From Swiss-Prot:
Its EC number is 3.1.1.4. Snake venom phospholipase A2 (PLA2) that inhibits ADP-induced platelet aggregation. PLA2 catalyzes the calcium-dependent hydrolysis of the 2-acyl groups in 3-sn-phosphoglycerides. This is Acidic phospholipase A2. The lineage of its organism: Eukaryota, Metazoa, Chordata, Craniata, Vertebrata. It comes from Deinagkistrodon acutus. One of its GO terms (biological process) is arachidonate secretion. The active site is at H47, D89. Belongs to the phospholipase A2 family. Group II subfamily. D49 sub-subfamily. Its main location: secreted. It catalyses: a 1,2-diacyl-sn-glycero-3-phosphocholine + H2O = a 1-acyl-sn-glycero-3-phosphocholine + a fatty acid + H(+). It comes from the Eukaryota. Signal peptide: none annotated.
């Protein structure tokens, strides 16, 4: 669920997903189109693609099971669809953490959608 995604971001990145990633670039936040603008925006693009491939459950609403082992998030549970949602969220949170050094709020926070018109790469 989106609430769990926020929790994973807090655990992995030590930042609020709501405040750092809800309106960044062309893909972080609701919707998304155009070409990702930087590495962080690409994390969101890949996350959107990942959610788009999930079938049989609702990535934004359905809860999943995970644990923490040696500081890493480990997705679990018996439902393969929910485990897939967890993996989408886990990979995105790690991607955010790994790209904090290039996060550029001055340029990409509340980035105008008119700048997101280029043809995107395929998922």
């Amino acid at each position: 669920s989106l609430i769990q995604f926020e929790t994973l971001i807090m655990k992995v990145v030590k930042k609020s997903g709501m405040f750092w990633y809800s309106a960044y670039g062309c893909y972080c936040g609701w919707g998304g189109h155009g070409r990702p603008q930087d590495a962080t925006d690409r994390c969101c693009f890949v996350h959107d693609c990942c959610y788009g491939k999930v079938t049989g459950c609702d990535p934004k609403m359905d809860s999943y099971t995970y644990s923490e082992e040696n500081g890493d998030i480990v997705c679990g549970g018996d439902d393969p669809c929910k485990r897939e949602i967890c993996e989408c969220d886990r990979v995105a949170a790690v991607c955010f953490r790994d790209n904090l050094d290039t996060y550029n709020s001055d340029t990409y926070w509340r980035y105008p959608t008119k700048n997101c018109q280029e043809e995107p790469d395929p998922c």
